[in-house]
Amino acid sequence: MPEGLKPVYVHRQSRTLSQVLTQLLIASNNYIANQVFLEIGGTLGGQVSLEKSLKVANAMLASNGFADSIHIEEGSGISRDNRFTARGLAHVLELFAPHADLFHGHDGGMNKTGTLDGVRTLTGYADTSSHGRVRFVISLTGNDGELRFRLLHAIEAEL
């Protein structure tokens, strides 16, 4: 915001971050995802910006060993310049495990879909009888999207 101007309206979120993230993960709201991402740049002080948020995110990724496996260009996940390896995303799931209950996915599972033109992803956690809770990443190109769910069900049946 230009110096000297005052905001016309300031919205204060009444829901907790956990509540916002749960709804975000259910509804796949790209706008809210990007707004949450922009807020992490606020930790540097002053106005939030994409540049600040990328700086914070990249520092966090590097400090957790993700520098080579995850690349973020924006916070909604719709940019083709956002890239990840399955191993990198599985590592994120490992760190996110204490918050796995935020996922409310397909068929009542703890998973999240991702869809771009020609790319279908399903990632999350599955409770198994012999291995307990396991994390999984299925990312496929050139399919109708339903294959990722059939693969998950086949994997769950074997675990």
Per-region residue spans from a language model:
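C-terminal soluble interaction/assembly domains
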Residues: 56, 71-159
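A small/polar active-site loop signature that marks catalytic segments
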Residues: 1-82, 86-87, 92-100
